[in-house]
Regions:
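A short glycine/serine-rich beta->alpha loop
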Residues: 44-45, 83, 150-157, 275-279
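Proline-centered loop/turn at the N-terminus of a beta-strand
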Residues: 76, 105-107, 251
Length: 296
């Protein structure tokens, strides 16, 4: 008597969460079995095809090999990234194809859709990104239905780390934050007004410098004037962005380091503006794993 044993092969997928500074490559065959590989960022807005290809070939592939990952076994690739507008997605897909060949299906979408899928799954809701920059949308369970343009840290990006840093520097230099806080800041950072102005107006990426000031803000959040500034930054985000989503339930879901670290202040701002706080994630990867394996 012979028995037939059928082996069920798990679907192998690659989920990529990419920003301008770093990229997380998550190789998974289930939502709780995965391997992470980290590389520099991939952003088609600021990088050429050759630069993106270099990250794939010189960083991702060798590090995947070190982890004994077999890219030939991949069934699907989901790349979510900053700057992945419809007109720029083809260049990203082309760079990925060099690594994974023609077998797997490759999908390239925006970081905002990643946030929406991670936070809301197949339900409708408000999805936000609150990190160095900010973004938001109303998601109907399948796609982005409404979107308020973020506009960057000069014209917009309310609620972001960059705008928080900008408002903090404004308060320190103009004296609207407490004198005690000002003294502690200059003592810890060994800087001056002239140095700060130079970094903001003459450095290559001032938004990153401004966002980095969160390292000072968070440990000193007990200062009343500083906490009020953080809450006000989130309120401005809600007023300028979230109120536009007339169909959405008054529940704010957010992903990103600023949302995660300042959850208490975000919840306070939401309450002041008539909203509740929903799901908060530091990174979208956990939610994306659940989303893609629940919908396989």
């Amino acid at each position: 008597v012979y028995s037939i044993i059928r082996y069920t092969r798990f679907k192998m997928i690659l989920i990529v969460d990419s920003g301008s500074t770093k990229t997380d490559w998550c190789f998974a065959d289930s939502s709780d079995v995965y391997v992470l590989v980290h590389t520099d960022g991939i952003n088609p807005v600021v990088q050429s095809y050759d630069e993106m290809l270099s990250v794939v070939q010189k960083q991702m592939l060798p590090r995947a090999k070190q982890q004994s990952l077999d890219l030939a076994s991949l069934d699907e690739v989901y790349f979510y990234g900053a700057g992945c507008t419809p007109e720029l997605r083809l260049a990203v897909e082309k760079a990925l194809r060099v690594a994974v060949d023609e077998k797997p299906s490759v999908y390239v979408d925006s970081d905002l859709l990643a946030a929406a899928r991670a936070l809301c799954g197949t339900d409708s809701g408000i999805a936000c990104i609150l990190g160095t920059g900010s973004n938001s949308c109303y998601y109907d369970g399948e796609g982005i239905k409404e979107h308020t343009p973020a506009l960057g840290y000069i014209l917009g990006d309310e609620g972001s780390g960059a705008v928080l840093g900008r408002n903090f520097i404004n308060g320190i230099l103009k004296g609207t934050l407490s004198r005690e806080l000002r003294d502690v800041f200059f003592d810890e950072y060994h800087t001056s007004q002239a140095d700060i102005i130079n970094k903001v107006y003459h450095s290559a990426m001032p938004n990153r410098f401004l966002a980095s000031l969160s390292k000072f803000i968070l440990p000193h959040i007990d200062d009343e004037s500083l906490e009020a500034l953080v809450v006000r930054n989130f309120e401005n985000f809600i007023i300028s962005n979230i109120r536009n989503y007339s169909e959405a339930k008054p529940v704010i879901n957010a992903v990103g380091s600023v949302a995660f670290l300042y959850r208490k202040q975000l919840e306070q701002a939401a309450m002041l503006q008539g909203y509740e706080l929903g799901k908060i994630l530091k990174s979208p990867l956990e939610g994306l794993l659940d989303y893609h394996f629940a919908n396989k």
